[in-house]
C-alpha cells in the first residue's frame, strides 16, 4: 500500500523541495510546471479536503491559502515534521496512507493528492477508490495529479528515453513503482461511480478530476 517505499520517502524528506524546484536534472521534466500543477489541484478542490501523501506540505499550503479546511495524511514521520514546520500548525497532519487512515471528523467534499497515487498497485488503487466512493457524497470529487501514461507503449518509451539520456535513477523509479495508464484509471474510477477527466500537465503528469455520480 505504498509503505514499502517509506525508507525512500524518509531519505527524500530533506531534499524533496529542491527536487521539485528543478535542481535534480533527472526529475526536472517530471516536476516541470510543479507550482502550476499544485495550483490547478487546489483550485479544483472543494472546501473540506482529505489530502493523501502530504509530503512536505506544498499542496496543503496552497489549499490553506484558498481558505480550505485540510485533513492531511502522510506515512513518513520526517515528511510530517517538515510539513508541520512549513504550515505552522494550520492543518491537521496525521499518520496514515491511501488505504489505512483516520476518518475525518466532518464530511469531506474532496480527496486530493499530488505525485503519490502511483505508490499503490492497480489492485490497491481499486481498493482505495472503493473506500473513497463511500466517503464522498454525490458531487464530491477526487482531484489527483500524478505521473501516468496514455498507454503501455508511451510508458515503455518513457523508460527507454530515460535510459538513453543516462537518467538511470528515473528509469529505475519508473520500473520500480506502480505507474499505470489512463485507460486503467478511467476504468477504476467508473467502477466506483466516478466520472473522470484527465488533463496532461507535462511529459509525465496528468491532473485527474473524478466526480462522484448520483447513486
UniProtKB/Swiss-Prot annotation:
Residues that bind S-adenosyl-L-methionine: 53, 74, 97
Which CDD domains does this entry report, sorted A to Z?
AdoMet_MTases
Q: What is its EC number?
A: 2.1.1.-
InterPro entries reported in the protein's UniProt record: Methyltransf_25, SAM-dependent_MTases_sf, Uncharacterised_MeTfrase_YrrT
Q: Give GO terms: molecular function aspect only.
A: S-adenosylmethionine-dependent methyltransferase activity
**One GO process term, biological-process aspect:** methylation
UniProt entry keywords in alphabetical sequence:
Methyltransferase, S-adenosyl-L-methionine, Transferase
The record's annotation in PANTHER family points to: TRANS-ACONITATE 2-METHYLTRANSFERASE-RELATED
What is the purpose of this protein?
Could be a S-adenosyl-L-methionine-dependent methyltransferase.
Protein family according to the UniProt entry? Belongs to the methyltransferase superfamily. YrrT family.
Please state what the protein is called: Uncharacterized methyltransferase GK2543
Task: Name its species.
Answer: Geobacillus kaustophilus (strain HTA426)
Amino acid at each position: 500500500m505504498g509503505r514499502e517505499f517509506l525508507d525512500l520517502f524518509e531519505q527524500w524528506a530533506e531534499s524533496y523541495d529542491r527536487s521539485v524546484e528543478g535542481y535534480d536534472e533527472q526529475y526536472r521534466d517530471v516536476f516541470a510546471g510543479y507550482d502550476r500543477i499544485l495550483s490547478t489541484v487546489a483550485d479544483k478542490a472543494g472546501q473540506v479536503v482529505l489530502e493523501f501523501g502530504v509530503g512536505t506540505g506544498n499542496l496543503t499550503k496552497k489549499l490553506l491559502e484558498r481558505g480550505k479546511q485540510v485533513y492531511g495524511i502522510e506515512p513518513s514521520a520526517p515528511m510530517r515534521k517538515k510539513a508541520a514546520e512549513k504550515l505552522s500548525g494550520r492543518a491537521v497532519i496525521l499518520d496514515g496512507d491511501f488505504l489505512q487512515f483516520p476518518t475525518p471528523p466532518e464530511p469531506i467534499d474532496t480527496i486530493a493528492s499530488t505525485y503519490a497515487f502511483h505508490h499503490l498497485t492497480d489492485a490497491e488503487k481499486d481498493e482505495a477508490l472503493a473506500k473513497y466512493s463511500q466517503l464522498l457524497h454525490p458531487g464530491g470529487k477526487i482531484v489527483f495529479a500524478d505521473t501516468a501514461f496514455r498507454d503501455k507503449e508511451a510508458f515503455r518509451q518513457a523508460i527507454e528515453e530515460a535510459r538513453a539520456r543516462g537518467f538511470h535513477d528515473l528509469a529505475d523509479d519508473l520500473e520500480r513503482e506502480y505507474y499505470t495508464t489512463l485507460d486503467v484509471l478511467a476504468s477504476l474510477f467508473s467502477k466506483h461511480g466516478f466520472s473522470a477527466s484527465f488533463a496532461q500537465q507535462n511529459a509525465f503528469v496528468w491532473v485527474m478530476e473524478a466526480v462522484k455520480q448520483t447513486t
